[in-house]
Amino acid sequence: MKFQSTLFCLCVAMLQLATLADEPKPSSRPNVIFILTDDQGWNDAHFAGHPYVKTPNLDKLAAEGTWLRQFYVASTVCSPSRCGFLTSHYPARHLIHGHFATHELNEKRHMPHWLDPKTPTLASLLKKSGYATAHIGKWHLGSGQGAPTPEAYGFDFVRHTTGNKSYWEENGEDPYFRAKSTSLFVDETIKFIRENKDGPFYVNLWTLLPHAKLNPTPEQLKEYESISPQADHPAFGPRMKKYLGNAKNLKNQSQVFYASLTDLDTQLGRLFAALEEM
């Protein structure tokens, strides 16, 4: 399978999809994998200048693809961002200005309980055009009684967390569930891609990591057991230096965060390798 990495502007893509849905051209339609990591800062990767974290697979992706360094974010919060990615709309258009929580908290903030499933989405437009569509990983676009599942928004294949009728539940039975979650998500993504390798397909791969609470496995932590991070490293800007300088235990906290990022990178590397083999 030809593996071409490109980060593109979804608003432009949505404008193009109106034509795509009406005039499908099988030979020219690319397969798309949209990887969304959770709470990974713009410089939390080696290629972006981080002095300690190891991300060889993301480094390779950035070197071979397109790295966009100037951007605008309508909302940096979880659910509004996801709404924007799916719809290409400002989240405020859907009254989604904060993360979805309990219905009581949603009402106090004058928010709906979920994204209206009647809203056209990237997935629903691609599905109309003949794409096989999948959502794998974190959802966080509505939960609780009556909340639609990702299938209602145009996804054929769904393996999700943080939503109604979740495929995986982070219920505390496995203290390392979050630490191992990217591996589970990548397994399902590879399975879906292999079953639809003749395309076209669209996949959301939305990870839980490196969002807190983080609890890497002992094996994941080994990579950083001898690290001695410095809060005043010249690679960090003034705000980051101040933030790290206030850490209660900089070494321990850095080990946990960096180990989580590196495992994320390792699992994505498995996905990239699988794509190269197809």
Predicted regions and their residues:
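Active-site-proximal cap/lid insertion segments
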Residues: 24-30, 37-53, 73-76, 99, ...
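A short, compositionally biased domain-edge/stem linker segment
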Residues: 14-24
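Hydrophobic anchor at the start of a short beta-strand
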Residues: 132-133, 201
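Bacterial N-terminal signal peptides
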Residues: 6-16
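Catalytic metal-binding/acid-base residues of hydrolase active sites
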Residues: 40-41, 90-91, 139-140, 208
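Active-site segment of extracytoplasmic enzymes that catalyze sulfate/phosphate-ester chemistry
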Residues: 21, 34-35, 42-131, 145, ...
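Positively charged n-region of N-terminal signal peptides that target proteins for export
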Residues: 1-5
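Generic enzyme active-site microenvironment
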Residues: 36, 136
